[in-house]
Structure formats: structure tokens, C-alpha cells
């Protein structure tokens, strides 16, 4: 808006930006609906009364986070995952131009993580809301973010498009990975390779070898894998876990030398 934040009144600031923190808030005798309705504070009069329009926005916000069924529940008695969804609904209820979220996927199961990311994506694309999120799950950041900022322990900052910033080498360096690997393309983590002389050869391919590779890793059995084309979906996991991977270049027939 071309103005300093310090020039905003508290209500102007609240209409512009909403925040969702991981810190738990303590409430007494407040339903989930009451907590969400707090997001309408910047728009209410001196007495804080909600209009019919406000009530509609509260219901829409609850519906957006799939929380209408717990709207009348005591906020202090719901689970951490439900609490996170209610706090997001409160932020949505403010109708902000900017929303800042601190690890919003904490305490959420996979279904509600996906739903939350869908909501944030919709807010950014359809409602033109600037969404700023702090995440430890880089695999989620890679899928949803237009731009990412990585901050290392030494304070070094990397900023840019996910496909430019999230590389295997950079992530290994950023997190100091020494026990295992992270595959940026698939957003998957593999534990360290089993040590010792390989006693097993796994003939996989087309996804048939992945679960066997991981089971052998859990059992601590070193193994070889192949013959895999370099574009086979088994290849990244085999490369991370196998002592040796016998490969062939993609789109080429398996040659005699490979055997």
C-alpha cells in the first residue's frame, strides 16, 4: 500500500494481516464459533456486535476448514489438530490481504494437511491473498510455494523458486545430512545404507523393488540392485539404499556389458 506499518491503526493492521501461530491460546467458556468470530473484531462497532454478514463469514470460514461439526464445542476441550483448524478459520475470517502462518501443518494428519494446503493455495490464487508460511516439511514447501527462503544455522539465506533452491546437495548441506539422503524431486527421505558386503541381489523395476529395498535396509542387510534404467521409479531409492546399482541408460536396450 506504500505505507509504513507503523502508520497503520490497529484496526487497519488487523484488516490487512492475520497471523496463525503454533502457540496455544487459553480460553474460558468459549466455543469454537466464538474463537472464529474474534476474527471479525476489526469490522465490528464499539460493542463488538456481529451483523448478519459477519455471521455468514464466520460460517463460511468454519466450513472452509471442515470445522462446522465442532463449531459449538468448547475450544479448550478440542484436540490440537482441531485447534489448529479453528485458528486458521479465525484468520480467514479477518478477510486479510496477507496471512502469516507458523508451522500450520503441526498436529495435523495427512488428510487435514492436504486440505489446509488446498485452502492456502485457493486463498493465494482466487482471493489474491499473500500467504507466508514457515515450514519444516520441505517436501510440502516444494509443492505449494511460489518462492521459498531457506535459512541455515549460520544465518545464510537462500531465496528463489523451489526448483532452483531445493537441490539434493543444498538440502544435505543446509540440514547437515550424514545419516541418510533426501530426494528433492520426489520429496522423499531414505535412511542410511546397510553396511557390509552385499548378500542379496534385488531384480526390481517399475516400482516393484522399492518396498524390498526398504525392508532390507530395516533388517540391516546390504544388497545390490538392478538392472534398472536411470529413469525407472525404483532407481532413486535403489541409489540411496543399495551398495551397488547396476544401471542402463534410458531408452537403450540392456547391453552385454551390463550383464
Region locations from a protein language model:
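Helical segment within the ABC ATPase nucleotide-binding domain
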Residues: 114-127
Amino acid at each position: 500500500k506504500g505505507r509504513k506499518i507503523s502508520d497503520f491503526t490497529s484496526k487497519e493492521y488487523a484488516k490487512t494481516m492475520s497471523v496463525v501461530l503454533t502457540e496455544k491460546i487459553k480460553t474460558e467458556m468459549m466455543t469454537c464459533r466464538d474463537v472464529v468470530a474474534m476474527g471479525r473484531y476489526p469490522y465490528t462497532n464499539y460493542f463488538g456486535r456481529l451483523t448478519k454478514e459477519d455471521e455468514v463469514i464466520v460460517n463460511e470460514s468454519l466450513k472452509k476448514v471442515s470445522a462446522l461439526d465442532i463449531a459449538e464445542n468448547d475450544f479448550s476441550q478440542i484436540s490440537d489438530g482441531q485447534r489448529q483448524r479453528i485458528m486458521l478459520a479465525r484468520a480467514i475470517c479477518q478477510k486479510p490481504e496477507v496471512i502469516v502462518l507458523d508451522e500450520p501443518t503441526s498436529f495435523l494428519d495427512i488428510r487435514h494437511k492436504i486440505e489446509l494446503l488446498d485452502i492456502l493455495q485457493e486463498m493465494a490464487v482466487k482471493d489474491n491473498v499473500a500467504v507466508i508460511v514457515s515450514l519444516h516439511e520441505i517436501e510440502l514447501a516444494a509443492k505449494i510455494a511460489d518462492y521459498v527462503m531457506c535459512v541455515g544455522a549460520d544465518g545464510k539465506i537462500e531465496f528463489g523458486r523451489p526448483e532452483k533452491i531445493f537441490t539434493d546437495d543444498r538440502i544435505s548441506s543446509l540440514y547437515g545430512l550424514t545419516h541418510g539422503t533426501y530426494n528433492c524431486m520426489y520429496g522423499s527421505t531414505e535412511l542410511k545404507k546397510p553396511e557390509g558386503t552385499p548378500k542379496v541381489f534385488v531384480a526390481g523395476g517399475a516400482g516393484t523393488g522399492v518396498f524390498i529395498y526398504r525392508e532390507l535396509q530395516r533388517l540391516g542387510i546390504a544388497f545390490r540392485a538392478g538392472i534398472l534404467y536411470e529413469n525407472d521409479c525404483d532407481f532413486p531409492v535403489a541409489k540411496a539404499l543399495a551398495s551397488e546399482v547396476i544401471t542402463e541408460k534410458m531408452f537403450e536396450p540392456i547391453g552385454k556389458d551390463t550383464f
